[in-house]
């Protein structure tokens, strides 16, 4: 989990912006979206090969 310390004389907006940036870097929201619904390994492989095929063209 991203953790920041609010600096002296720092506004709440800038602290919130720093927190959002740190959480985006750590990938918390991406991991949450990925784990929201279970996906079978065979489906993952199929999606990965489809994405590779799309990139190729």
Swiss-Prot record:
Q: Per the record, GO CC terms?
A: ribonucleoprotein complex; ribosome
Does the record bear Phosphoprotein in its keywords? Answer: no
Keyword Ribonucleoprotein tagged:
yes
Output the InterPro entries linked to this UniProt entry: Ribosomal_bS21, Ribosomal_bS21_CS, Ribosomal_bS21_sf
Stretches of the chain forming a coiled coil according to its record? none
Sorted keywords for this record are: Ribonucleoprotein, Ribosomal protein
One matching Pfam family = Ribosomal_S21
Gene3D superfamilies hit by this protein: Ribosomal protein S8
GO biological process, alphabetically ordered: translation
Q: Where is the composition biased (Basic residues)?
A: 33-57
Region described as Disordered: 23-57
Q: Which NCBIfam families match?
A: S21p
Family the UniProt entry places it in:
Belongs to the bacterial ribosomal protein bS21 family.
Q: What is the designated name of this protein? A: Small ribosomal subunit protein bS21
Q: Which organism is it from?
A: Brevibacillus brevis (strain 47 / JCM 6285 / NBRC 100599)
Highest classification ranks of the organism = Bacteria, Bacillati, Bacillota, Bacilli, Bacillales
